[in-house]
From Swiss-Prot:
<feature type="binding site">
    <location>
        <position position="13"/>
    </location>
    <ligand>
        <name>Mn(2+) 1</name>
    </ligand>
</feature>
<comment type="function">
    <text>Isomerase that catalyzes the conversion of deoxy-ribose 1-phosphate (dRib-1-P) and ribose 1-phosphate (Rib-1-P) to deoxy-ribose 5-phosphate (dRib-5-P) and ribose 5-phosphate (Rib-5-P), respectively.</text>
</comment>
<dbReference type="InterPro" id="IPR006124">
    <property type="entry name" value="Metalloenzyme"/>
</dbReference>
<dbReference type="InterPro" id="IPR024052">
    <property type="entry name" value="Phosphopentomutase_DeoB_cap_sf"/>
</dbReference>
<dbReference type="GO" id="GO:0005829">
    <property type="term" value="C:cytosol"/>
</dbReference>
<comment type="pathway">
    <text>Carbohydrate degradation; 2-deoxy-D-ribose 1-phosphate degradation; D-glyceraldehyde 3-phosphate and acetaldehyde from 2-deoxy-alpha-D-ribose 1-phosphate: step 1/2.</text>
</comment>
<dbReference type="GO" id="GO:0006018">
    <property type="term" value="P:2-deoxyribose 1-phosphate catabolic process"/>
</dbReference>
<dbReference type="GO" id="GO:0043094">
    <property type="term" value="P:metabolic compound salvage"/>
</dbReference>
<feature type="binding site">
    <location>
        <position position="339"/>
    </location>
    <ligand>
        <name>Mn(2+) 2</name>
    </ligand>
</feature>
<dbReference type="InterPro" id="IPR010045">
    <property type="entry name" value="DeoB"/>
</dbReference>
<keyword id="KW-0413">Isomerase</keyword>
<dbReference type="GO" id="GO:0008973">
    <property type="term" value="F:phosphopentomutase activity"/>
</dbReference>
<feature type="binding site">
    <location>
        <position position="327"/>
    </location>
    <ligand>
        <name>Mn(2+) 1</name>
    </ligand>
</feature>
<protein>
    <recommendedName>
        <fullName>Phosphopentomutase</fullName>
        <ecNumber>5.4.2.7</ecNumber>
    </recommendedName>
</protein>
<dbReference type="Pfam" id="PF01676">
    <property type="entry name" value="Metalloenzyme"/>
</dbReference>
<comment type="similarity">
    <text>Belongs to the phosphopentomutase family.</text>
</comment>
<dbReference type="GO" id="GO:0000287">
    <property type="term" value="F:magnesium ion binding"/>
</dbReference>
Length: 394
């Protein structure tokens, strides 16, 4: 008999809670995503996360300990060697990743692009981090006139190739992206995703078409999600979860436009009758505020998210479990634009916890979440991770 019929897992993308013990190896000494945002805001107002026990993990400005937290609380340390979204999420579901995905804030190495030019017969322009619309405004006309390929990246581990559909036919663009995917399986160039970004229109009025195609990497092994799906449990992926796992172990995928849309979709799944896992990623914290080093925007987004939690609490049933965590840090006060190697918070709450919660031991790997989910549903346990299911008292 499952202890919980439904588990709702929420990943607040990049919401770290202080430097990890190995932060120095990543150039991240002193990083502290929530702590620094709380200082910047002169106190973060997150009363619902505080009720669950956020301040009991660690007190920060505006975030204090409570006598009787509603939930169980601790922090988790990442075991894998990367600090990117895919590594963090894959570890949460029971995998250990010893090859970090690469990010290219200065653009891609010349050797890689030379090889891509040679194999495709087309010149490459761009080669820098940029937003998709800005790069088209800047280079779209040149691409049309020369037949070159616009190659660009973002703060994430991606290589994107844009070309006008009337200049480079879709079939050819897709072939080019497959070549790029092969080249980037090499450890030193390993990107999580290669993306075909076709566009149409005239200079000054370019638009990206729906013919985008992603060439992702599948997880390097079976995850707890695969085990759940194969045992006929529901795995509802909300936001970019399905992309992160390349659809592996997903039974239903709900796309989101924003954090608030993500919270709406979470409420929708709370209203659904299912048995299994609802898995939500809230990406705005990372994409809109962390990489852009915007502590004010980040703080406001955290407060907006917190204000939606009472709606979630009200719909949770006695046999539901809510787990809230993060996948890495992205301290908006830290130098640079990259993620930061930090501990992440873990909060666990069910309305059946009548006595309230208490501190859980520090988790040595994010995979403890996957192990807990697996044990709850009686599916094969992951190779990594220790379940804390029996420590959650009703």
């Amino acid at each position: 008999m499952n202890k919980y019929k439904r588990i709702f897992l929420v990943v607040m993308d990049s919401v770290g809670i202080g430097e990890a013990p190995d932060a120095e190896q990543f150039g991240d000494l002193g990083s502290d995503t929530i702590g620094h945002i709380a200082e910047h805001m002169n106190g973060l107002q997150m009363p619902n996360m505080v009720k669950l026990g956020l301040g009991n993990i660690r007190e920060m400005k505006g975030i204090s300990k409570v006598e009787k937290p509603l939930g169980y609380y601790t922090k988790m340390q990442e075991k894998s060697t990367g600090k990117d979204t895919m590594t963090g999420h894959w570890e949460i579901m029971g995998l250990y990743i010893d090859t970090p995905f690469q990010v290219f804030p200065e653009g891609f190495p010349k050797e890689l692009l030379d090889e891509l030019e040679e194999k495709t017969g087309r010149k490459i322009i761009g080669n820098k981090p940029a937003s998709g619309t800005e790069i088209l405004d800047e280079l779209g006309q040149e691409q049309m006139e020369t037949g070159s390929l616009i190659v660009y990246t973002s703060a994430d581990s991606v290589l994107q190739i844009a070309a006008h559909e009337e200049v480079v036919p879709l079939d050819e663009l897709y072939k080019i992206c497959k070549i790029a995917r092969e080249l980037t399986l090499d450890e030193k160039y390993m990107v999580g995703r290669v993306i075909a970004r076709p566009f149409v229109g005239e200079p000054g009025n370019f638009t990206r078409t729906p013919n985008r195609h992603d060439y992702a990497l599948k997880p390097f092994g079976r995850t707890v999600m695969n085990e759940l799906k194969d045992s006929d449990y529901d795995v509802i992926a909300i936001g970019k979860i399905s992309d992160i796992y390349d659809g592996e172990g997903v039974t239903e995928s709900l796309r989101t436009k924003s954090n608030m849309d993500g919270m709406d979709k979470l409420v929708d799944t709370l209203n659904m009758d299912f048995t299994g896992l609802s898995f939500l990623n809230l990406v705005d914290f990372d994409a809109l505020f962390g990489h852009r080093r915007d502590p004010q925007g980040y703080g406001e987004a955290l407060q907006e998210y917190d204000a939606r939690l009472p709606e979630v609490f009200a719909k949770l049933k006695e046999d539901d479990l809510l787990l809230i965590t993060a996948d890495h840090g992205n301290d908006p006060i830290h130098p640079g634009t990259d993620h930061t190697r930090e501990y992440v918070p873990l909060l666990a709450y069910s309305p059946s916890m009548k006595e309230g919660g208490q501190e859980l031991p520090l988790r040595q790997t994010f995979a403890d979440i996957g192990a807990t989910v697996a044990e709850n549903f009686g599916v094969k346990m992951p190779e990594y991770g220790t379940s804390f299911l029996n420590e959650l008292k009703k």
